[in-house]
């Protein structure tokens, strides 16, 4: 998937830091700890301690997407760490809303999990998504992603 970018200027995120890892940030009066990563598109990762399945993503997702910190808007991954090799993720994609899967988002979430010390670089990390599991491996050189392809739709378009 390429090299993970942590430099805020390249994400882009308007914060004067070398990187944004576990950084306190307030959105709509609530403080979150955020980690920002670019996988060729901007991601903001938020680790959740509570019930990720009942998170009101339709409510909080747009607030992150359109926050002034992100001049090009942002994809936001809400992540619960299950163990040091497994995370569960829900994603709010800029311009689309909640989606069942996002490859670059899963990569960003795994990178953030390593940068925050929840997982280890070089280890396979399973990212559990509504649309299925992906396995991510983050190294200093690149981020690898593997997963199953599954047919979900077939149709015909007349032109």
Per-segment meaning from a language model:
Residues 1-100, 111-159:
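Active-site proximal loop and beta-alpha junction motif in alpha/beta enzyme cores
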């Amino acid at each position: 998937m390429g090299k993970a970018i942590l430099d805020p200027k390249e994400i882009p995120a308007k914060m004067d830091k070398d990187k944004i890892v576990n950084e306190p940030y307030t959105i709509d009066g609530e403080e979150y700890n955020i980690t920002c990563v670019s996988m060729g598109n901007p991601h903001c990762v938020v680790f959740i301690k509570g019930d990720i399945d009942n998170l009101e993503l339709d409510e909080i997702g747009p607030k992150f997407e359109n926050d002034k910190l992100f001049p090009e808007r942002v994809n936001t991954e809400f992540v619960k760490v299950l163990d040091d090799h497994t995370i569960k993720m829900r994603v709010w994609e800029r311009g689309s809303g909640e989606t069942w899967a996002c490859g670059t988002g899963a990569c960003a979430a795994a990178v953030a999990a390593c940068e925050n010390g929840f997982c280890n670089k070089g280890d396979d990390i399973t990212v559990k998504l509504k649309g299925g599991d992906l396995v991510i491996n983050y190294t200093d050189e690149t981020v690898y992603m593997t997963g199953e392809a599954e047919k979900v739709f077939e149709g015909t378009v007349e032109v």
